[in-house]
Amino acid sequence: MPGLRPLLSPPASEALLLAQAQQLSGYSLGELAALAGLVAPKDLKRDKGWIGVLLEIWLGASAGSKPEQDFAALGVELKTIPVDSLGHPLETTFVCVAPLTGNSGVTWETSHVRHKLKRVLWVPVEGDRSIPLADRRVGSPLLWSPNEEEDQQLRLDWEELMDMIVLGQVERITARHGEFLQLRPKAANAKALTEAIGAQGETILTLPRGFYLKKNFTRTLLARHFLLQG
């Protein structure tokens, strides 16, 4: 642990970012919180994004919840991913909020989803709920860009979901739509409504939606990387 400290400014290169992330591997969240002068919450019920915030502090992330990537100068997005003892993802991964209006002319190439997933630093974290939060360890990081096949898989799902949004079918979309990318309501409470297009082209109010990567996508991605690593 000697010399291990959070980055006070965004890293100047991918190599520096990855090196810092690799240094965190094996440490518990409690240890990293203490070194950063923070107290780990008992659980994540009221602090759902706490692990991400902790790692943003350690890695010198800049964006917060702004639309650009967490490491805007590098074009890299940070994604923490809770995994079980086998390294399998325990939940879907939030990508970004879905635009429900003003989508004429939008393409996969210029989409927010593709922008966010262009370059991702994945940091697996133990997610087994039987392990106290402070004792959960950080795993080995992975700096990833979608290959041609992954990009095509995501594009097909995105196009299907966006077609439904544009055609006024947002209320008919379920988590089962999309093979690897899904659209789900994203709101802290059911009163937070946003405008969308209805079946007759009229403006309706509905829950905000978010794009999420399904577990089958991230599981394959992590498994391939760590098999290669091994």
From Swiss-Prot:
Gene3D superfamilies: DNA mismatch repair MutH/Restriction endonuclease, type II (3.40.600.10). Coiled coil: none annotated. It is found in: Cytoplasm. Keywords: Cytoplasm, DNA damage, DNA repair, Endonuclease, Hydrolase, Nuclease. The keyword Ribonucleoprotein does not apply. It comes from the Bacteria. SUPFAM superfamilies: Restriction endonuclease-like. The keyword Coiled coil does not apply. GO terms for molecular function: DNA binding; endonuclease activity. One of its GO terms (cellular component) is cytoplasm. Its main location: cytoplasm. InterPro entries: DNA_mismatch_repair_MutH, DNA_rep_MutH/RE_typeII_Sau3AI, DNA_rep_MutH/T2_RE_sf, Restrct_endonuc-II-like. GO terms for biological process: DNA modification; mismatch repair. Sequence-specific endonuclease that cleaves unmethylated GATC sequences. It is involved in DNA mismatch repair. Belongs to the MutH family. This is DNA mismatch repair protein MutH.
